[in-house]
């Protein structure tokens, strides 16, 4: 996109990958910035910027909304209890195949993340506790697991975090502010390392 900034070619490239852009807002932002201000006015330009503005309005920024949900033992856990630490907040569900895959990937990264001082908290949007517990048993996850049994559609926590699909992950700073949405593992390590330096 940068190579063809200011041309209709760049617009066509973004149009072709618009679906991916809507999944990854950070990438969408970089692509729109790469277009520059010198894009010829046309219907496609308007469509791209309209899609960008709508997606931008859905982004969560500032303080992470606090919540309290039960863990596997039924104990209520509050997000605010982890203030002072980096938190990787993961929204998922047992019926979500990409979420289950992410669990397996995170299993490999978790020891290193934990040793770096980062807490991982997963919030299941399952409406049936038994399915959630079975998935945890199968995936053998070791980090903090919470459930919102109201389910995906009714979850107030999901709404507060503007989660439209799972998996959705937020990196939250020690001050409780949202740092990144759907970060890559490398980005997480880099931010934690920078802030601890």
Describe the predicted segments one by one.
Residues 1-77:
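Oxidative protein folding and maturation machinery
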Residues 83-84, 91-108:
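Conserved redox-active cysteine motifs that mediate thiol-disulfide chemistry
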Residues 84-86, 116-118, 140-143, 174:
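Loop/turn elements at helix/coil->beta-strand transitions in domains of secreted/extracellular proteins
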Residues 86-87, 167:
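Alpha/beta-hydrolase fold active-site loops
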Residues 89, 121-123, 146, 170:
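Conserved hydrophobic packing residues within short motifs/helices of P-loop NTPase cores
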Residues 101-139, 150-159:
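Structural microenvironment flanking redox-active thiols in thiol-disulfide oxidoreductases
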Residues 141, 150-193:
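Thiol/disulfide oxidoreductase modules built on the thioredoxin-like
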């Amino acid at each position: 996109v940068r190579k063809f900034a200011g041309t209709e070619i760049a617009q066509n490239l973004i149009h072709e990958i618009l679906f991916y852009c809507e999944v990854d807002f950070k990438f969408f932002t970089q692509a729109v910035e790469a277009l520059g201000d010198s894009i010829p006015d046309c219907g496609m330009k308007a469509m791209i910027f309209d899609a960008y503005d709508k997606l931008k309005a859905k982004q969560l920024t500032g303080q992470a909304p606090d919540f309290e949900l039960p863990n596997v033992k039924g104990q209520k856990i509050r997000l605010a209890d982890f203030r002072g630490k980096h938190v990787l907040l993961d929204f998922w569900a047992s019926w979500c195949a990409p979420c289950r895959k992410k669990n397996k990937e995170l299993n490999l990264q978790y020891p290193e993340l934990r040793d770096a001082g980062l807490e991982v908290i997963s919030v299941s949007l399952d409406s049936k506790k038994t399915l959630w517990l079975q998935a945890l048993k199968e995936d053998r996850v070791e980090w903090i697991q919470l459930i919102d049994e109201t389910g995906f559609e009714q979850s107030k926590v999901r709404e507060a975090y503007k989660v439209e699909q799972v998996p959705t992950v937020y990196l939250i700073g020690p001050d409780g502010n949202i740092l990144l949405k759907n970060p890559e593992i490398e980005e997480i390590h880099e931010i934690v390392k920078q802030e601890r330096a």
